[in-house]
């Protein structure tokens, strides 16, 4: 990007010419060939608050953490269109062109009924009710924590791109060398960016922050986030991404209100300035704790405000990438707290037919989620001119490597060594080192893998999303049965001759 900047003589100089990022529509040609691809029913079940490790091996998880407040990041693998066996290959030239997929339709299906899941903490750092207090609270005791539960902020979110989404959160920063931090001082804060992975926690109403590093009590927020990082999508950063690969488009719906008002127990780190109040007497001589916090609530969930289970058609992406699936992959990020019901499961230890005894039963919590991903892909072609290949190489060299355009080394003119007895123990091993597999740039991140390499179909009318696409695009499916013409009568059949009219 070229910008005008002022010089020392307060004269604005013209910018230096630089290469510009262009839209994929300028070098990608779309065809009239469409495919449908859909996943199987995707299910996951676990504990809504924390993962359960194995008793004899804490590093092994026997029950994962599955919450309605987690991000679901699906990494959708697509087949290579350049290896497709098309019935008619006359629409492109494999010598000078390459094929890519463009996502033009998406539907995220959600099963399970609407419901509100709650969370809480058996030892929440709550001192007093500051909303409707009928007395002035005195000084806190040694331990004033209470068992409190609440519902969370309501969020529905769907992000689509060919790279993982970027999140933001507040974490502990590094102080300057001349600002020494002593125990008990408030640490400096820093806005950090990180990749949103499958299983990361969303903003629940307590802020997008690193609760592990910034809340040492482990009791200021509910159990499911007290030792986690709550991330919020960094829309500003993703929208400003030059090539537009991270975010094609997004759907978002958030709502929250505050249900209760409390304050914390503990010592106030930054006292209220004396010029903000007039000192009291008696029970008000000592100020109450001024560290207030609310309990969030997402309010009512309703089917009238759902963004899922409906198709979306992408005509124009928000960035320069207009839906082209570089690397034959897509990243679909989903959040849906409107189906966060936590199921209560009870198992009997001993039979108690006559009287109820709570110790005879064990109580468990489980949360289950159900997804279904459906796509419509359009086949596109790219003509490999020198300018286009140079531009793609500057954007992402791995794309050309996938198209078998890597650099080939010239033949060596030096003398090479060749041993006679290659299996002899008297010489060094002659086995060639195996070729290293291509390194996955996202191997260090956790995603929900969805393989659609064998799920493509050109029969769009055989799938619900395909029929919706044909209807809105004005296409008609090819008829499966041809209505034949009525057969002509046989030659032996004769028609009676008409009687000639005569005048009298």
From Swiss-Prot:
Q: Which Pfam families does the record associate with it?
A: Late_protein_L1
Keyword Methyltransferase assigned: no
Q: Keywords assigned by UniProt?
A: Capsid protein, Disulfide bond, Host nucleus, Host-virus interaction, Late protein, T=7 icosahedral capsid protein, Viral attachment to host cell, Viral penetration into host cytoplasm, Virion, Virus endocytosis by host, Virus entry into host cell
**What would you give as a GO molecular function for this chain, any one?**
structural molecule activity
Q: Which GO terms describe its cellular component?
A: host cell nucleus; T=7 icosahedral viral capsid
Which residues belong to the signal peptide in this entry? none
The Gene Ontology biological process terms listed for this entry are: endocytosis involved in viral entry into host cell; virion attachment to host cell
Instruction: Give the InterPro entries listed for this entry.
Output: Capsid_L1_Papillomavir, Capsid_L1_sf_Papillomavir, dsDNA_vir_gr_I_capsid
**What interactions and quaternary structure are annotated?**
Self-assembles into homopentamers. The capsid has an icosahedral symmetry and consists of 72 capsomers, with each capsomer being a pentamer of L1. Interacts with the minor capsid protein L2; this interaction is necessary for viral genome encapsidation. Interacts with protein E2; this interaction enhances E2-dependent replication and transcription activation.
Name of the molecule in the record:
Major capsid protein L1
Q: What is the lineage of its organism?
A: Viruses, Monodnaviria, Shotokuvirae, Cossaviricota, Papovaviricetes
Q: Coding gene?
A: L1
């Amino acid at each position: 990007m070229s910008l005008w900047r002022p010089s020392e003589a307060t004269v604005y100089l013209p910018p230096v010419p630089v290469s510009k990022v262009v839209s994929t529509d300028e070098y990608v040609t779309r065809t009239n060939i469409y495919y449908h691809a859909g996943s199987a029913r995707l299910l996951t079940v676990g504990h809504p608050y924390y993962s359960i490790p194995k008793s004899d091996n804490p590093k092994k998880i026997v029950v994962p953490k599955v919450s309605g407040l987690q991000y679901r990041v699906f990494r959708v693998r697509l087949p290579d269109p350049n290896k497709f066996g098309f019935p008619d290959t006359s629409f492109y030239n494999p010598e000078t062109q390459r094929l890519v997929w463009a996502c033009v339709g998406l539907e995220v299906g959600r099963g399970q009924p609407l419901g509100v899941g709650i969370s809480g903490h058996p030892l929440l750092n709550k001192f007093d009710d500051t909303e409707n207090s009928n007395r002035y609270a005195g000084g806190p005791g040694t331990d004033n924590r209470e068992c409190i539960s609440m519902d969370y902020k309501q969020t529905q979110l769907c992000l689509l791109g060919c790279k993982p989404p970027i999140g933001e959160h507040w974490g502990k920063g590094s102080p300057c060398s001349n600002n020494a931090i002593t125990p008990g001082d408030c640490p400096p804060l820093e806005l950090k960016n990180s990749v949103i992975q499958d299983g990361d926690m969303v903003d629940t109403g307590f802020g997008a922050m690193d609760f592990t590093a910034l809340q040492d009590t482990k009791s200021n927020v509910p159990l499911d986030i007290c030792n986690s990082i709550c991330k919020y999508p960094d829309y500003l950063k993703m929208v400003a991404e030059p090539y537009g690969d991270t975010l094609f488009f997004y759907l978002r719906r958030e709502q929250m209100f505050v249900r209760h008002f409390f304050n914390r127990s503990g010592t106030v780190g930054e006292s209220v300035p004396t010029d903000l109040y007039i000192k009291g007497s008696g029970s008000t001589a000592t100020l109450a704790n001024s560290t207030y916090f609310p309990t969030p609530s997402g309010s009512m969930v309703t089917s009238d405000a759902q963004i899922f289970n409906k198709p979306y058609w992408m005509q124009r992406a928000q960035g320069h990438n207009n839906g082209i699936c570089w690397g034959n992959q897509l990243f679909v990020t989903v959040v849906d707290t409107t189906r966060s019901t936590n199921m209560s499961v009870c198992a009997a230890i001993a039979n108690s037919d006559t009287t109820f005894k709570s110790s005879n039963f064990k109580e468990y919590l489980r949360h289950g989620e159900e997804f279904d991903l459906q796509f419509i892909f359009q086949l596109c072609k790219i003509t490999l001119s020198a300018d286009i290949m140079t531009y793609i190489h500057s954007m992402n060299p791995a794309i050309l490597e996938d198209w078998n355009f890597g650099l080939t080394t010239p033949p060596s003119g030096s003398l090479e060594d060749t041993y006679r007895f290659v299996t002899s123990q008297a010489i060094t091993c002659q086995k060639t080192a195996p070729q290293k597999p291509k390194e996955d740039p996202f191997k260090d991140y956790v995603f929900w893998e969805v393989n659609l390499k064998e799920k493509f179909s050109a029969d769009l009318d055989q799938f619900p999303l395909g029929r919706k696409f044909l209807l809105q695009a004005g296409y008609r499916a090819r008829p499966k049965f041809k209505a034949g013409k009525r057969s002509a009568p046989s030659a032996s059949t004769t028609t009676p001759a008409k009687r000639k009219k005569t005048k009298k």
